[in-house]
Amino acid sequence: ITWDEEFSHRYDEWSASMTVDIDFYVDLARNANGPIVELAVGNGRVAVPVARATGRPVIGIDTSAAMLDQARTNARTANVQLELREGDMRDLAVSEPAALIYCPFRALLHLPTWADRRRTFERVAASLQPGGRFAWNAFAFDHTVAPSLDGTHQDEPVPHTNRYFVGDNRIDITLDTGAKSSIWWATKNEWLGLLDVAELEVLYGGFAREPFTDDSREYVFVARHS
């Protein structure tokens, strides 16, 4: 079984602990005067509440057909409109410049290289209207703890094992079923560098809009297109 197939059926369990982000992205969407786009929309965990709160459709993009099927079902159940598209965020293109593009639940970490992320950020910038916003979150990982965590098995939220590869900034996540995925962490300066090349301006960070500190465990960025 592939990661996409397995994960689409376990996503609600996997994401159960992440709820604080929904109100954050909903609030941004309410203040967006124009199209709203979610990258890595998954099963609509965030897009459905955003569409419900704003009364407007959300354009949702994901590479996983299995996750998009779940999103369609969840949108029908909630009686909201999602415009779902199977595609890669690195190739983002919209017919009308967006007022808000957001990428929740650390999904940008699935992009393995600087070039992949730079391309995505440039496509986001090209897809935003002047003054449009780009928001996303990613964990702030302390790589010095990686050796002590390598190979650890966790039962929650879904039974899995983590392997850490510091030289590659990579974490391999393998479910007990054998399905595997990888994420690549980035530092604060790497994120800020991506904003610079895409000519996006950081407004603030944190789900409570607090500033970044050395103790932050989650990066939450909101940037504005100049």
What is the role of each PLM region?
Residues R118-P130:
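A short glycine-rich, Lys/Arg-flanked "PGG" loop and its adjoining helix->strand segment in the class I
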Residues K188-S226:
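C-terminal lobe and adjacent flexible extensions of AdoMet/dcAdoMet transferase-like proteins
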Residues A47-D91:
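Class I SAM-dependent methyltransferase SAM/SAH-binding core
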Residues A135-G193:
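SAM-dependent methyltransferase
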Residues I1-G34:
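Conserved class I S-adenosyl-L-methionine
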Residues A93-L100:
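A short acidic, Gly/Pro-enriched loop at the edge of an enzyme's catalytic core
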Residues A40-N43:
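Class I SAM-dependent methyltransferase "Motif I" SAM/SAH-binding loop
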Residues Y102-P104:
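A conserved beta-strand element that flanks and buttresses the S-adenosyl-L-methionine
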